[in-house]
Amino acid sequence: MPLRSEEGPYFGDFGGRFVPESLVAALDELSAAWEAAKADPAFHVQLDELHRSYTGRPSIVTEVPRFAEHGGGARLLLKREDLNHTGSHKINNVLGQAILTKRIGKTRVIAETGAGQHGVAIATAAALFGLSCTIYMGEVDTERQALNVARMRLLGAEVVAVKTGSRTLKDAINDAMRDWVTNVETTNYIFGTVAGPHPFPTMVRDLQRIIGEEAREQVLALTGRLPDAVAACVGGGSNAMGIFHAFLDDENVRLVGFEAGGEGADTPRHAATITKGRPGVLHGARSLLLQDEDGQTIESHSISAGLDYPGVGPEHAWLAAIGRAEYRPVSDAEAMEALRLLSRTEGIIPAIESAHALAGALDLGRELGPEGVVLVSLSGRGDKDMETAGRYFGLIEEGAVQS
């Protein structure tokens, strides 16, 4: 059976639905609405038109030869999801789920966010569709992504800083799930990645598939052939599944996900879930998790808020298990150096999340040599990361006014 035809709820041993009884009806309703929407031409017409006139799709592919000189001379092609409205791939998923929210008659949306890109996309869609909106964000992330907090609030969303646990993405998801249980009659949870209980992994992947479908045609037109490798950063894994999916059945195309190696995958401070994780259940699905000897989820670390998550989408865990995709850690330092290098060689400032894929792509380029072609998901732009990058590289003078 073609790998692209996998629909869940299970991907091999991973996936499923492990949730409180109070959420089963809401998930069933969402699953039924999603199946009905997929079969309804009007849904696709509405979503396609929004992508054309609002998101700005199709996103372009940019070749980056000066950057590629640092990676063995292979051709590096960037799929520019950073140019989408709201600055990342997140809008692809959010618009589809916002339409679904209206179709099932809910008036309020909630979401989790790490880097704030999903939150900004949700707040944007809520404004567009006239929905009430609450965003849960770990307190640590509200501090390192203050610009996106301001954006969400300007767009009319309530932003709740989560002060429990590690105060990052995992804890934001926990609180959003609690809200959904309490307010399920009026509220739809717009999950941001390919994790969580069924139908989220499949639905989010399907809404992000447009990345790879566009890129496949664009690379063929540009190079006359498929790429040797496709690279993407992996936290929960939605941008990666979005670009990988179109190539799943092309056996000669390597699919490589780059996880947050933090201070090193052999230290306690990383978020390299596939590299170092073991099977377990988190946020309603069975996948690979970072956990201690007692099976308790342990804190992850990444300089990137969007990759700072101790789990991963179940389809990624499955692709790793069957050997179709490979996953490697990229350290904070490697990602930040790639961010600076792309900025200085090509005039494109990537998100720190995306910079993990860029660092990995340089390694792939060296492995493939000058004849190689690597397609990279540039999942977001770096505006939100200027304070982090400014501190990291010493670019902001002490006491300088920041605007």
UniProtKB/Swiss-Prot annotation:
Pathway given in the UniProt record: Amino-acid biosynthesis; L-tryptophan biosynthesis; L-tryptophan from chorismate: step 5/5
Catalysed reaction equations from the record: (1S,2R)-1-C-(indol-3-yl)glycerol 3-phosphate + L-serine = D-glyceraldehyde 3-phosphate + L-tryptophan + H2O
Protein keywords: Amino-acid biosynthesis, Aromatic amino acid biosynthesis, Lyase, Pyridoxal phosphate, Tryptophan biosynthesis
UniProt cross-references to InterPro entries, sorted A to Z: Trp_synth_b_CS, Trp_synth_beta, Trp_synth_beta/beta-like, TrpB-like_PALP, TrpB-like_PALP_sf
Enzyme Commission number(s): 4.2.1.20
Cofactor list: pyridoxal 5'-phosphate
Coiled coil: none
Residue stretches spanning the membrane: none
Signal peptide span: none
Gene Ontology cellular component list: cytoplasm
SS bond partners: none
GO molecular function annotation: tryptophan synthase activity
Modified residues (N6-(pyridoxal phosphate)lysine): K90
Role summary: The beta subunit is responsible for the synthesis of L-tryptophan from indole and L-serine.
Subunit structure: Tetramer of two alpha and two beta chains.
Record PANTHER family: TRYPTOPHAN SYNTHASE, TRYPTOPHAN SYNTHASE-RELATED
Family per similarity comment: Belongs to the TrpB family.
This protein's name: Tryptophan synthase beta chain
